[in-house]
């Protein structure tokens, strides 16, 4: 095992034994749902940077996999929507985290009459070698884990997720990204990498890695401020590094011949005199009605130079629907 992965195990072993609220700064409020009560220790062990739980991914009784279980909060949230024995699988490589998560889930049983720990199947295993058969999962998720991996390990982890997902299955991810150049002295600090501070890569590089393993559709659902790394705190820096967190859904759709459909929140609006505009490529724009479009379609429409079509900038908050 690589030295940086061993350092990561040590960090999260300690985080399991001594919960650290500030270990990873979540940038989204914890869901408030009817009859969902989260144990205080589970909440303190929420080592994520966003959320991977979205109701629109969870219809039709999906089989769910969550990798890097932390204190179990997102396992509990997924179970809230499934409520069947073994419908949610959690995988973690840290024994102490697995033990702590089991204890938190038992406490969650006492706080939530609807919940049974039997809803969740926790397994020892690595994101780089998942203890799962091919094409057995509908929804897979990870929160603030994959950014820890160096490039080749990240590609391996993404391939593993792709392998275990059923066709059209969904991989939901939340990770830090940064458009700023992070010096090697910071990147190669194993502890900073384990703390989700030095492994952030540019968003486009992140998307390219996801699509390189075969995902044909990618949705950028949220993008928020996360951290500033300053020279005052990190002597290896000469200027501030701005880090954001993103929430992404990658769908195991077939890869289109002209490349993946990546939705970053762009929309096309036709405001001409006709009721509709048809680009004869499968996209029908209704008069004065915004249509969510992937970046590829947005560029193709922009290339038409049509005076009555407006293409919005990326919002990085895509919420469904659209051209593909």
Regions found by a protein language model. Give the residues of each.
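Conserved alpha-helix/loop element of class I SAM-dependent methyltransferases that forms part
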Residues: 25-63, 74-81
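Short, glycine-/aromatic-enriched active-site segment of Class I SAM-dependent methyltransferases
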Residues: 176-197
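A short SAM/SAH-binding and catalytic strip from SAM-dependent methyltransferases
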Residues: 138-152
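C-terminal lobe and adjacent flexible extensions of AdoMet/dcAdoMet transferase-like proteins
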Residues: 213, 219-225, 229-324
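Short alpha-helix
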Residues: 198-214, 220
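A short acidic, Gly/Pro-enriched loop at the edge of an enzyme's catalytic core
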Residues: 128-140
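Class I SAM-dependent methyltransferase SAM/SAH-binding core
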Residues: 60-129
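A short glycine-rich, Lys/Arg-flanked "PGG" loop and its adjoining helix->strand segment in the class I
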Residues: 155-170
């Amino acid at each position: 095992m690589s030295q940086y992965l061993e350092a990561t195990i040590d960090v999260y072993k300690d985080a399991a034994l001594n919960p650290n609220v500030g270990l990873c700064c979540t940038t989204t409020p914890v869901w408030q749902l009817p009859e969902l009560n989260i144990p205080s220790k589970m909440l303190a062990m929420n080592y994520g940077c966003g959320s991977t739980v979205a109701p629109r991914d969870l219809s039709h009784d999906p089989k769910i996999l969550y990798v890097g279980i932390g204190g179990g909060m997102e396992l509990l949230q997924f179970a809230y929507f499934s409520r069947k024995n073994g419908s949610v699988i959690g995988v973690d490589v840290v024994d102490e985290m697995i033990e702590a998560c089991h204890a938190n889930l038992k406490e969650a049983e006492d706080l939530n009459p609807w919940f049974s720990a039997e809803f969740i199947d926790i397994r020892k295993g690595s994101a780089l070698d998942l203890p799962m058969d091919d094409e057995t999962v509908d929804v897979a998720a990870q929160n603030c884990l994959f950014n820890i991996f160096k490039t080749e390990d990240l590609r391996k982890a993404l391939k593993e997720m792709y392998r275990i997902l059923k066709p059209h299955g969904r991989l939901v991810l939340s990770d830090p990204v940064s458009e700023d150049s992070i010096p090697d002295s910071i990147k190669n600090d194993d502890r900073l990498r384990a703390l989700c501070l030095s492994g952030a890569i540019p968003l486009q590089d992140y998307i390219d890695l996801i699509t390189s393993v075969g995902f044909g559709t990618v949705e950028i659902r949220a993008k928020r401020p996360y951290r500033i790394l300053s020279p005052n705190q990190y002597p290896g820096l000469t200027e501030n590094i701005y880090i954001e967190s993103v929430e992404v859904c990658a769908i195991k759709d077939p890869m289109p011949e002209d490349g993946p459909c990546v939705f970053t929140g762009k929309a096309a609006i036709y405001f001409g005199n006709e009721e509709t505009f048809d680009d004869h490529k499968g996209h029908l724009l209704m008069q004065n009605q915004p249509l969510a479009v992937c970046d590829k379609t947005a560029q193709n429409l922009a290339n038409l130079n049509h005076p009555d079509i407006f293409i919005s900038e990326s919002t990085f908050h895509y919420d469904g629907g659209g051209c593909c």
